[in-house]
């Protein structure tokens, strides 16, 4: 996907990665992991976490990694320290599964991201080790609202994605059984409360998935937070502030670029002018690798901060 042989994109199972991270945390001997514990509220005045089952736990510092609908963020906001806004796209998504072929092999090339761009909507497919594919339809909300009957679903896929429809015998059943998910961007300012709580991951910066950078953004933020905590071990509040000052510009930058990449994926790749520009960018990078690089390549294949990649691309 870049101009160099090593510029590839690796797709891994989120479930497997979560298991690896949980195992690593548990192996330290300093982490107690509890499943099925749903946070209801953070009570700063009493220094307790309250859970939906009525249980409470005392705390010293809370690291809120509880996702886009973060209860920790809501608690920080209640103290007047955090402001946040979620902007929803008038688009949604639905996941489907492309099964293995009759002989157990992949039905499509497993070493590629497959995209069926259709202007206002698109279908993408990523291979799994089990030789099936996770397929996602991204489309405007009115499109999903029009697909209310089996006949409408069947007609839509046969008309727009005939090759895909022919490979999935239970397509209609899958479509009706699987939920339609929302797509939105959450931006926040004030990621911490004194030296008592701090946000990480989607709780601080939730973005749409079209650049494949949401988890990377979160991990980069955790690395930055860790560095500031090591530099200021006796002043957590200052460490939290420095962490946000460093990461907020990059979070906003990749949020914008992810939204732009949705347009590029569903419409740009079928625009001859856009593709000609892309080819020119790659050729210029090949000839002048230290002077020019496409924005996509800077984001995906370098450790350049997101804001720097955005600004450099704008100058080019």
Regions inferred by a protein language model and the residue ranges of each:
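Conserved FAD-binding catalytic core of PHBH/FMO-like flavoproteins
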Residues: 22-23, 28, 34-183, 187-193
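Short FAD-binding loop at a beta-strand-to-alpha-helix junction that anchors the flavin cofactor
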Residues: 192-209
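C-terminal helical "tail/cap" subdomain of flavin- and related membrane-associated enzymes
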Residues: 227-316
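C-terminal lobe/hinge of AMP-binding adenylation domains
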Residues: 3, 203, 212-213
């Amino acid at each position: 996907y870049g101009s160099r042989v090593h510029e590839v994109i690796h797709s891994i199972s989120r479930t497997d990665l979560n298991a690896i991270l949980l195992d690593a945390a548990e192996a330290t001997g300093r982490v107690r992991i509890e499943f099925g514990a749903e946070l209801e509220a953070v009570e700063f005045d009493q220094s307790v976490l309250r859970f939906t089952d009525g249980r409470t736990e005392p705390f010293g510092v809370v690291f809120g990694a509880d996702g886009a609908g973060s209860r920790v963020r809501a608690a920080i906001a209640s103290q007047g320290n955090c402001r946040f806004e979620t902007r929803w796209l008038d688009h949604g998504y639905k996941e489907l599964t492309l099964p293995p072929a009759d002989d157990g092999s992949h039905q499509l090339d497993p070493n590629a991201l497959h995209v069926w761009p259709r202007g206002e909507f698109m279908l993408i497919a990523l291979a799994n080790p089990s030789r099936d594919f996770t397929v996602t339809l991204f489309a405007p909300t009115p499109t999903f609202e029009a697909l209310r009957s089996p006949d409408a679903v069947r007609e839509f896929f046969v008309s727009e994605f005939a090759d895909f429809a022919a490979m999935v015998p239970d397509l209609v059943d899958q479509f009706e059984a699987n939920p339609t998910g929302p797509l939105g961007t959450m931006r926040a300012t004030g990621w911490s409360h004194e030296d008592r709580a701090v946000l990480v991951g989607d709780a601080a910066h939730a973005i749409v998935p079209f650049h494949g950078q949401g988890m990377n953004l979160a991990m980069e933020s955790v690395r930055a937070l860790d560095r500031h905590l090591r530099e200021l071990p006796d002043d957590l509040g200052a460490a939290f502030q420095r962490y946000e000052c460093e990461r907020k510009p990059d979070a906003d930058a990749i949020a914008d670029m992810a939204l732009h990449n949705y347009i590029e994926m569903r419409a740009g790749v079928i625009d001859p002018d856009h593709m000609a520009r892309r080819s020119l960018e790659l050729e210029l990078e090949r000839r002048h690798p230290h002077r020019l690089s496409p924005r996509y390549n800077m984001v995906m294949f370098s450790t350049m901060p997101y804001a720097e990649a955005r600004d450099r691309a704008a100058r080019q």
